Amino acid sequence: MNRIIFCTFFKKKSEGQDFQSYPGKLGKKIYDQISKKAWEKWIEKQTILINEENLNMFNLEHRKKIEKYMKLFLFKK
C-alpha cells in the first residue's frame, strides 16, 4: 500500500518512501516529509556533488558535507 504524505519539497501530497532511507532523527524527518520522487531527485543531485567535488564517503568530513547539502536541498535550510 502506498503511503501518501505532504511532501515539503514539492509542497503537495505525494507518494511517501517505502522505508526510512537515512538513519536517525533526520532520517525519520525525511521519511515523514519527503516524497519518493523528491528523494530520487536528491540521490541524483548527491551523485553529481560527490563526483564534482571528488568526495569520498569513507571520509567523515565528506559525509558531513553531503549531509549539509542534503538538508539544504530537501528542506531549503
UniProtKB/Swiss-Prot annotation:
Gene3D superfamilies the UniProt entry points to: Fe(II) trafficking protein YggX
GO cellular component, one term: cytosol
InterPro entries: Fe_traffick_prot_YggX, Fe_traffick_prot_YggX_sf
Keywords for the protein's UniProt record, in alphabetical order: Iron
Record GO biological process: cellular response to oxidative stress
GO molecular-function term, one example from the UniProt record: iron ion binding
Taxonomic superkingdom: Bacteria
Similarity section: Belongs to the Fe(2+)-trafficking protein family.
General function of this protein: Could be a mediator in iron transactions between iron acquisition and iron-requiring processes, such as synthesis and/or repair of Fe-S clusters in biosynthetic enzymes.
Quaternary organization: Monomer.
Protein name: Probable Fe(2+)-trafficking protein
UniProt source species: Buchnera aphidicola subsp. Acyrthosiphon pisum (strain APS) (Acyrthosiphon pisum symbiotic bacterium)
